[in-house]
Design a protein with these regions (language model features):
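Short conserved active-site loop signatures built around small residues
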Residues: 135
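Short, high-confidence coil segments that cap the C-terminus of an alpha-helix
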Residues: 150-154
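Acidic/serine-rich, low-complexity amphipathic helices located in mid- to C-terminal regulatory regions
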Residues: 159-161
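Conserved "HGTGT" condensation-loop signature of ketosynthase/thiolase-family condensing enzymes
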Residues: 1-124, 144-148, 174-199, 205-207
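Short-chain dehydrogenase/reductase
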Residues: 139
């Protein structure tokens, strides 16, 4: 049997209605940083990580050891990690790529390694950047590691660098996220049966 023992989030439990965009919709945001993120300014990933990888969480893992293998997966699928954000030209991530000749997506693996070492995880460390909703995809990876590869515990950190206009418009136009005008239709959600649809930022969590 697979079950979750603890969960931490970096955003407010109640989603915020963003209605000054072409496709008005609710989204889970960090209120004090959303103003800059909305304009397309990257929110440093390590700042977001620090919000959920707290001393309490680290102490919980340390004080509740499990026998056997422990894995860690960093779920980060936002294209901002790759320095590919169309909202602004002077992209600090792309500049980093140019100056140090390091593809920015590689930093997800660096972050994953650093965070895993904080938890004392060495059996399996990986990055899941398969899609913008990597935190949903990673649930299947957790099940696979436990059922087929003999893992007893898997720690998952999902992080996005910020909700901005580009993402809201892309998800809204494609119908991937739930628009405000459709909320009363009670569409099924990928995460739960309460919201009635997918809200941007709903997959950012540490479990």
């Amino acid at each position: 049997m697979i079950y979750m023992t603890r969960c931490e989030t970096a955003y407010t439990e109640t989603p915020t209605l963003i209605d000054d965009v072409p496709y008005p919709q609710h989204a889970h945001i960090i209120p004090e940083t959303f103003k800059n993120a909305k304009r397309g300014m990257a929110y440093p990933p390590h700042k977001l990580i620090d919000r959920v990888v707290t001393e309490d969480v680290l102490a919980y893992v340390e004080n509740n050891p499990v026998e056997g293998k422990t894995g860690f997966i960093f779920a980060a699928g936002n294209q901002g990690w790759m320095g590919n954000n169309g909202r602004y030209d002077k992209n600090p991530e792309a500049e980093l790529h140019y100056k140090v000749k390091l593809p920015f997506i590689v930093l997800t693996n660096i972050y994953a390694g650093r965070i895993a070492s904080m938890f004392g995880v060495h059996d399996h460390v990986s990055t899941d950047a398969s899609a913008c909703a990597s935190s949903l995809k990673v649930l299947m990876d957790v099940q696979n590691l436990i059922n087929n590869f003999g893992f007893d515990r898997v720690i998952v950190l999902g992080a996005e660098d910020g909700v901005n206009n580009l993402i809201l418009e892309f998800f809204g136009e494609s119908g991937a996220s739930l628009q405000y005008k459709d909320e009363d239709k009670r569409q099924p959600s990928a995460f739960d049966d309460i919201n009635g649809g997918f809200f941007i930022g709903q997959g950012a969590v540490l479990a």
